[in-house]
Amino acid sequence: MEEPKMGLEEYKGVYIYAQQVDNKLSNIAFELVGKAKELAADLNTEVTAVLLGSNVKALATELGEYGADKVIVVDNPALETYRTEPYAQALVSVINEYKPEIMLVGATAIGRDLGPTVSARVKTGLTADCTKLEIGDFPINAMPGQEQKHNQLLMTRPAFGGNTIATIACPDNRPQMATVRPGVMQKLPKEAGRAAEVIEFNPTLEENNRYVEIMDIVKAVGNVENIMDAKVLVSGGRGVGSAENFEMLRDLASVSYTHLTLP
């Protein structure tokens, strides 16, 4: 029996998944809030950040200062460290309860795991690794015999190995979901004292056979930078020829305030 189509008019608001690791918000969370504010302005709606974790409520303050209008906090010991199943259950519960029109997730290691899992469970589409998001008509150019729908999320991403650019829409299902590449969108200036409405939501997280147990976490120690935060990279490989020549690249990176990477 065919499932009834969802009432698209029930879905409102631009939501973002506010990634945090070790109770520290990732930069992508602020970038998504910045882009969400632009989209929300076009739709005359609000921006809601979804914050999942354990003892993370205090992070809602910073999300408000960067532009979020509301923060939904799901605080549960099962969410202390990222695991696919409990995080997917939590985000699916938020979507089913609050019905966002748009749901944005960072295209990080976590987001690339969480986003597709959630989109499959709520039976909607997801466009991955987006580099541009805007509100517009779909089809972009009116076509005879085909309805042109307005106020759609147009999601642009590289395709076919980067040889072409595709613009994708999800006109018949909600939420419209996308993962967004870090470093592409701009975060807004921090507005000290700006407060978001904080909503505490506590869905039941059911342990099942998809749960995994984290036995241990070993964190690397050293002066290793996160290249996702870098504007410029100096990279060297086998072609450098020797350890001595590689030091020249290290010197270049140090004087130009860039990061040195290996391919």
Label for each model-derived stretch:
Residues M1-L260:
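N-terminal glycine-rich FAD/FM-binding segment characteristic of electron-transfer flavoproteins
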